[in-house]
Amino acid sequence: MKNIIIFGAISVAYAQVSFSGNTETRLAESSSGYYYNETLINTNLQYDAFTNWIQLEYSDPPELGRGINGVRKMRLEYDNGPVKLKLGDLYEIWGRGLVLNSVDDQPIDRDTGIRGLTLMYNNPSFSTQVIAGKTDISQSTINALGFNNRTHNYHVSHNLYGLNIQKLLGNHDFGFSFLQGLEKHPVNTFPEDTLNLKNQLHSLSYSYMHSVFDFYTEYIMNRSYEFDEDRWSSHGKGKGLYGNLNLYFNLFSLNLEYINYRYAMIDPISRFNIVDYYGYNQPYQNPPVAVHIHENVLMNRISHQTDFNNEVGYKAELIGSFSDNIEFLSIFSQSNRTHSWVMDENFMWKKDKELSFLPKFDPAAMPFKDFYTELTFRTLQNKMFIKVGYADMKDIIDLLQNTVTDTSQSLTYSITDAQTIPLNFSYSFSNGWSIESKIELQWLSKGYWWYEEKNNQIIADSLMSIFLDDNGKRLDQEKNTFISFTVSKSPKWSLTLTSDKASVKESFLENKSIVNPLEKFLGIDQERNWVNVEFVYHITSSMRFSLLYGSLKGGLLCTNGVCRIIEPFDDGFKIGLSTVF
C-alpha cells in the first residue's frame, strides 16, 4: 500500500512538471587566427504556476564578448491569474521602448537585461508593473582604453527601479511610466575616475484601436543629476516623442512612424562619445527608429546608425497585394538632427539653425533617406516564389567642416550613396527537392563631399571617392555582388554556395585576404571575393548539424539602429550543432 501511495504521488508530480530546452554549439577557426568555441544551453522547468529558466554558457572564447563558463542567465517566474512575479534576469519592454526595452541581442553582443525583481498585476482594463534591479551594460567605444571589435571595452552599472501603469477605457489606452537609475559612470578625467549619476525617465502614452486604423503616441521627459560632494546637482534634461499610425484598407495597409528625440545636442565629432557625454539617452531604453531594417546582406552593411540622443525622422510603409499571387511593399524613411551645425572662428562646433519638425536633406544636419520597394510573385500552385526589389539610400555619416561667412561657405562631409537590386527565386519540386537563389547587385558611392562657395559662385561641389583601382586612380563607384545558390532535399539536408564580390578595394583597407582554396579552384580574384559553401543536415527532427567552409566578408551588422563591425573570416571552418528537447 505504501509503495502504491509513493508511486501515485510521483506520478501526479511528474504529470504536473514539464521540462524543455535547447542547446546550440558553434565552433570556428580561420587561417587568420580567428577562433571561437561556444555552447549555449537553455532549460525551462515548469511546475504548476512556477517556471524556471536557466541559460548556461561554455565559451573559450565566444564569437563576440567575454568568455563565460557556467550560469549566464536565470529566472524564476510565478504566474497565478492576474498576478505574475519574476525573479532573476529580466527582459521587459514598456510601451514601445522609450523608457524601457531591455534586450539580449547576441549577434551583436548587446545585453541590457536587468537582474532583479518585477511584480505585475493585470486585469482586462488595468495593468501595472513595478521593477527593481541592477544592470551591468558593456559597450564598445574608441573613447576608452582597449578598443577592439570582438570584446567590449566600456562597462557601466545601473541600479534601477520603476513603475509602469496602463488603463483601458473603451478603445482608449492610457499609460504612465517612471524609471530611475543610479549609475556608476567611468570617465577619463582626473582625479575622478567614476561619476555618480541619477537618471530619471517619465513618459505618458496614449493609444486608440479601431477596425480601420490604430494610433499610438508616447511623450518622454529625461532628467539627469550628478552627485557633487554632498548633494545632487542638475546635469541635463531632454525629451522625446514617438508616434505610430496604421491605416487598414481592403487590399493594402499604410504604416506611418515618427520620432523626435531631443535628449542632448552634441557636436558632430562627439555625438557617439558615450564616455564623456552622459546623462542623456540610456542603453536600456532602445526606442523605435525611423529606419527600415533591411534583411538583404548588402543593404544591411550600409545601415543608418541612429543618433538616439538627437534625431528627427519618419518612416512610411505601404504594403498590400494586387492579387492573390502578387504582393507589394514600398518604404520611404528620412531623418536628420534637430539642428544644423557650423564652425566658429576658432573652428569649434556650435549649433546653427533649428530645423523643422519634419526632416529635410540639409548636409549640415547629417541627414539620411532611404527608399525601398519590392514585388513578390507566387505561381505554379505556390511552387515558384520570386521577389524583386530596388533600394536607393543616401546617408551623410559625418560632418567634417562647415564654415560660413557673409560671402562664403566651405562644407565637407562623408557620405554613403547606394542603389541596390535584390532578387530572390525559389522553386519546390513535388518529391521534396527544391532550389533557391539570392542575387543582390549594388552600386556604392562612398567618400568625402566638398562644397565651396565664394561671392555667390560655386567653386567646388564634388565627391572624393575612397575607391581606387589597381593603378591608384579614384573610381566613382564600387559594384558589389552577393550571390547564393541552395539545393535542398526536405526534410534532411541542404547545400549552399555563396559568393560575395566587390569590384574595387577601399583605399584605407590595406589588409590582404588569405588564399582560399575554394576561390582558387573557381579561378576568381581572391582579393575582392569571399566564397563559402555550407552543408546543413537534420540528424533528427530536433537536431541540426551545419558545416561551413570558406571566407566571409564581414562588415557592419545592425539591429534597431545599433550597429557593430563584424571582422572578416578568411579561409576557415564553422561548425554548428543545435538540438531541441
State each model region's role.
Residues 38, 69-74, 112-116, 159-163, ...:
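Short alpha-helical segments and helix-capping/turn motifs at coil-helix boundaries
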